[in-house]
Structure formats: structure tokens, C-alpha cells
């Protein structure tokens, strides 16, 4: 999911900037590579047709029949958050900020995933809701559900379009494919396999995507480390050349926590309080425990124990993802080279756009390019080369670190596998958002507000129609991204604005019997408005960032975590105050919805090696060890 978007992808004009490229594609596919990509497209469509017969009822179509094993649900759960947009973005962030980017995979995911599995999942699963807005309806009533449902629906369509356009742009840059061709091929494939097989088809394709991403990307860090001389060699080379690039001690690139006691002491410009409370609590818990795109995968598990185990299984793989994402970004700092053998230095998307080349290979706007490069750490020789134009004059962005490393290390067949992994990631992001949109539209908007008495087959038909409409609107969103350079910033804001108030409302609803219907509705609605107000304040008055993040040294990445923290606090205060001023529901009505008012079903005893708490403790031990190791 796109909720945890890297700053490099949410900057002023991330995706449209890539359209500025006019030079040759980064890679040329051999017949074997093309065959690998064609086989992938054939497989995903075949899966949709194969599973159509198992997706005839609403429970089968929208919830995969609740038949998924813990392993399938767990892999799908973590895979839903492994879209290529995220992988490329965080590899680029690692190039910029070093190992600090790993926080978004560890402290920004693991505690929340364990909390979902062990604490929250029993309530989601026992109440048999089809969606997170469905839980809000049961706990707070229809008004709260409607706010959540419409917010989710808009977010999912926009995110599907962003993934669609991002894939098309990457294919243009890497392979030279036409933008429109890529958009329509991907949209037709997604509409076919999700429309036919529903959530079951989306889940199985996400598991396929998980395998492809690891298979396509694993060789890059292995071969890169070998060339760099291992971890010690990588550190030594970064120490040699990073001081001149950033002005920050390159030693900071290898520490998670040591340099976070002050905003100015680390490359990311964040403080440990923002990492722990803003990212580690509000953003992380808000995404992993309330975002329907990922929660839907766990709700598809075949029983409560499987539903609890799924996020725990996913957390093991989540801790390993930095090896194929963060490490290639770090390796790119020392291994990427220009054609003349000099070190290739990546820059921001705004610089790429300002220094775009015309058809003759010359910089189109030399004045703007000069001004943009002056704000970077590009060497004078590199800047002169860009201004001179011609071969090897083209700049590449941070977000291209992973594709550039793939092109460097993957040969025929393997390059096709790597490109297929990127395509699979983008299409999985599209499919996940479209399938979630279909469920939310059908169960949380259409059924309660338009047609409450339809037959089961009618709602399946509505769900399939919603997928077609969702894909069509996503195509429009993709072209909107193409022409609206700042939309990625607003898409990220849409997500971060919504999750903090939603988390507050759900936590109070699940753990405090006194929380009332009006408190849930107003806490969510006014919390969203408050968070949006903070976003617009910083957008219109950049100096306000220092106030929101509590430091004049804060960088844009800090704004996201602190805005989420303030929005959570604001919504929490509202829920508490309004609940104390209004009448609560009778405790008898809260059965299955709130701790202290619910008797959870008894589960049969299992061997210790199948006990979810044992595995959760193991995750905590590994998580703690990793943070200490890279402190």
C-alpha cells in the first residue's frame, strides 16, 4: 500500500518528472526477457479464469470464502505492502538517507503487525465484518462508517491510478514502452483477473508477486555486496566519498538511532520522538491495523488462529525486506557508474525535470537546470557534463536506484525476471486497491445507502461492476497524475490525514466501553479536518513546518510523522470529551466489539511450535536484536 510513501516519491513532482527523459531506455530486453514477461501476464489472467468458479457467492468473491491458510494470508498481507512504487521509493530513500530508511520497515511495521494479530484481529474476525468501515458501523453507527467508506474509496481509486501510471512511466524509462500502451495492458489484466476471481484471485497473485520480487531482486544485493567487498567494504567506500556529497558524516548512514537525538544530526532530519510516536505508533498502527487493503487479507483466513498467525508470519518476511530494498540503495552510492567509469550521482526528481533533454540531447531549459543543480551536491565536473549535453549527460533520480542496479547486474532472462517483479509489484498494488474498493463500495456504500435488500448474486454482480468502474476511473486518475505534478504530495496527504483520526476512533471503540456513537463520528470527521488543516498550513506557509515538527531543523519527512501524531492526539481528546458528555450504549450491545464486553471463542490447544504467542516472542527478539545491531 502506498500509505508509507517514501519522501522521494511524494516530493513536488515525482512521477511526471520521469516523463522528461528523452534519452535511450536504460535496458534492452532480449527475447528471453520478453518471454518471461509474457508468461507472467498469461499466468495472472489464467489464475483469474481458474478461480472464477470459486468466486460465485459474496463471501467467496469479497472475502475469498474465508478459506486462506495462515501462510497464504500472511504472505498476501505483507505482499500487499510490497508494491514496486514503495520498493523503488525506499531504495531511493536509502540512497539519500542511509539505513534510517529501514525504520519504515521495522519500527514502522513490526510492533503494529504483532498488535493486529494478537490483540485486534479477534474483534475484526469474530464480528464477521467484511471491512474496517463495517466494524465502525457495528461499533459507532452508519455515520462513522460512511465517512470511513468514502475516504477509503477515494484513496483506493487514486492509489490504483498512481500505481498504474507509475508502472507505465517506469516501463517508459527502463524499456522505452509507450505510456498509454502500458496503462491499458495493465488495466485490462487487472480487470480480468480481479473481476473474475475476486479477492481470492488478488491474494494468489500477491503471493506470486512476493515470489517474483524476491526472485527478481535477490541477486542485486548479493552481487553488489560481492563487488563492494562485503559490508565492511561498502562502509569503507561510502565513508570515502559521501562527505563531499551530503556534508553529513557518512557514519550516520549506518545507524538507526544513534544520531536521532537532534534533527540536524542525521541525513533524514528526523527526531527519535517522531520516529517512535509519530511513525512507530500513529502511522504504523494506523496503517497496519486499520487500512482495509491489508486487513482484508487477514480477514480471509480460514479460522481465528490462522487470522492471528497471518500478521506474525508476515512480520518475519517484513524484517527481511530491507535486504532487497535498502541494501541496493546503499550499494548504489558506490557502485553505480557512468559510461566513462566515473561515479554516477543520483538527484531529486525536481532536478531531473529541470534538466530534461530535448530531442537533440541538449538541456531544454539551461537557466532552470543550472539553478536546480546548484542546490545539489553534484560536482562541478558533473554539472558541466550535463550542461554540455550529448552522451551520458542525462541525470537519473533517486527513485531509479533499484532499476539501475537491476540493469547493472541482471543478464538476459534474469533482467526479464527483475522487470517482471517490478510489473508484478505495480499490478499487485492496482489489484489490491481495486478489490478493496469493490468491497467497500458494495458493502459500505451501495448496500446500506442504495439497496439494502438485494440478493447475494446481485451484490456479487455489483462488486464485479465496481471493479470495472474502479479500473476505468483509475485510468483517469493515472492521466490526472500525468498532468498534475503535485498530486503525489496530495495522495500521500490523503492517506496520512485519514489514518491518524481513524486509529484513535478504532482504538477507543475497541478498548473503551464508554466511547459513544457521536464521539466516534465527530472524532473521525473533525480529526480528518484538523489533520487536513495542518497539511494545508505547512503547504501554504512552509515556515510552519518548524512549528508542526517542533524544530527549525526539521525536514519534510518529519512533517508527516508529527502531523499524524497531533491529529491522533486531537481526535483522541475529542472522543474522550464527547463520550463523557453523551450517553454510552448498553454493554450488552457491545458483545463481540469491545474488550471487557466480549467472550472470545475458545481455541483448541496446539503444540508450542504452532502457538502464535511463541512466534510473536521470537519476532520481538529478532526485532530487538536488529535495532541493537544497527543502533
PLM region spans:
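Membrane-embedded helix-loop-helix hairpins and adjacent transmembrane boundary segments
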Residues: 2-631
Amino acid at each position: 500500500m502506498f500509505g508509507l510513501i517514501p519522501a522521494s516519491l511524494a516530493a513536488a513532482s515525482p512521477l511526471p518528472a520521469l516523463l522528461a527523459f528523452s534519452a535511450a531506455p536504460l535496458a534492452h530486453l532480449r527475447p528471453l526477457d520478453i518471454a518471461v514477461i509474457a508468461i507472467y501476464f498469461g499466468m495472472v489472467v489464467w489464475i483469474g479464469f481458474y478461480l472464477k468458479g470459486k468466486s460465485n457467492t459474496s463471501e467467496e468473491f469479497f472475502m475469498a470464502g474465508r478459506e486462506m491458510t495462515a501462510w497464504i494470508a500472511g504472505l498476501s498481507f505483507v505482499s500487499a505492502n510490497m508494491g514496486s512504487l514503495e520498493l523503488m521509493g525506499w531504495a531511493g530513500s536509502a540512497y539519500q538517507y542511509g539505513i534510517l530508511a529501514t525504520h519504515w520497515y521495522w519500527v514502522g511495521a513490526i510492533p503494529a503487525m504483532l498488535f493486529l494479530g494478537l490483540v485486534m484481529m479477534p474483534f475484526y474476525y469474530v464480528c464477521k465484518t467484511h471491512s474496517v468501515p463495517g466494524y465502525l458501523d457495528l461499533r459507532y453507527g452508519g455515520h462513522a462508517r460512511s465517512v470511513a467508506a468514502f475516504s477509503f474509496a477515494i484513496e483506493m481509486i487514486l492509489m490504483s491510478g498512481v500505481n498504474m501510471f507509475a508502472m507505465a512511466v517506469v516501463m517508459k524509462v527502463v524499456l522505452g514502452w509507450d505510456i498509454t500502451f502500458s496503462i491499458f495492458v495493465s488495466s485490462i489484466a487487472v480487470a480480468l483477473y480481479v473481476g473474475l476471481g475476486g479477492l481470492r484471485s488478488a491474494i494468489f497473485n500477491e503471493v506470486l508477486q512476493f515470489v517474483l520480487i524476491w526472485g527478481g531482486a535477490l541477486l542485486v544485493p548479493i552481487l553488489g555486496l560481492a563487488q563492494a567487498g562485503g559490508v565492511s567494504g561498502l562502509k569503507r567506500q561510502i565513508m570515502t566519498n559521501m562527505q563531499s556529497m551530503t556534508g553529513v558524516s557518512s557514519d550516520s548512514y549506518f545507524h538507526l538511532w544513534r544520531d536521532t537525538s537532534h534533527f540536524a544530526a542525521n541525513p533524514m532530519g528526523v527526531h527519535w520522538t517522531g520516529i517512535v510516536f509519530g511513525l512507530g505508533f500513529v502511522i504504523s498502527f494506523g496503517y497496519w491495523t486499520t487500512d482495509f487493503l491489508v486487513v482484508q487479507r487477514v480477514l480471509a483466513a480460514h479460522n481465528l488462529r490462522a487470522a492471528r498467525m497471518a500478521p506474525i508470519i508476515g512480520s518475519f518476511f517484513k524484517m527481511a525486506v530491507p535486504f532487497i530494498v535498502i541494501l541496493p540503495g546503499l550499494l548504489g552510492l558506490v557502485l553505480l557508474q557512468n559510461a566513462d567509469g566515473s561515479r554516477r550521482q543520483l538527484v531529486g526528481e525536481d532536478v531531473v525535470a529541470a534538466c530534461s533533454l530535448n530531442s537533440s540531447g541538449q538541456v531544454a531549459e539551461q537557466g532552470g537546470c543550472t539553478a536546480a543543480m546548484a542546490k545539489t551536491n553534484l560536482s562541478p565536473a558533473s554539472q558541466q557534463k550535463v550542461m554540455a549535453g550529448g552522451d551520458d549527460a542525462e541525470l537519473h533520480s533517486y527513485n531509479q536506484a533499484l532499476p539501475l542496479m537491476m540493469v547493472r547486474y541482471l543478464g538476459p532472462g534474469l533482467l526479464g525476471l527483475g522487470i517482471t517483479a517490478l510489473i508484478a509489484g505495480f499490478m499487485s498494488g492496482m489489484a489490491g486497491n481495486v478489490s478493496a474498493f469493490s468491497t467497500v463500495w458494495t458493502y459500505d456504500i451501495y448496500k446500506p445507502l442504495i439497496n439494502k435488500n438485494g440478493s447475494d448474486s446481485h451484490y456479487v454482480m455489483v462488486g464485479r461492476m465496481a471493479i470495472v468502474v474502479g479500473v476505468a476511473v483509475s485510468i483517469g486518475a493515472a492521466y490526472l497524475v500525468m498532468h498534475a505534478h503535485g498530486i503525489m504530495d496530495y495522495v500521500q496527504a490523503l492517506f496520512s490525514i485519514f489514518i491518524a483520526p481513524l486509529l484513535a476512533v478504532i482504538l477507543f471503540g475497541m478498548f473503551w466501553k464508554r466511547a459513544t456513537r457521536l464521539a466516534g463520528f465527530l472524532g473521525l470527521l473533525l480529526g480528518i479536518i484538523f489533520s487536513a488543516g495542518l497539511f494545508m498550513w505547512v503547504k501554504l506557509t512552509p515556515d510552519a513546518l518548524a512549528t508542526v515538527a517542533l524544530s527549525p531543523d526539521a525536514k519534510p519527512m518529519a512533517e508527516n510523522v508529527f502531523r499524524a501524531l497531533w491529529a491522533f492526539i486531537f481526535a483522541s481528546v475529542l472522543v474522550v470529551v464527547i463520550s463523557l458528555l453523551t450517553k454510552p450504549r448498553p454493554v450488552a450491545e457491545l458483545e463481540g466489539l469491545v474488550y471487557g464486553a466480549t467472550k472470545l471463542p475458545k481455541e483448541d490447544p496446539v503444540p508450542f511450535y504452532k502457538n502464535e504467542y511463541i512466534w510473536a516472542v521470537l519476532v520481538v527478539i529478532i526485532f530487538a536484536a536488529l535495532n541493537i545491531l544497527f543502533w
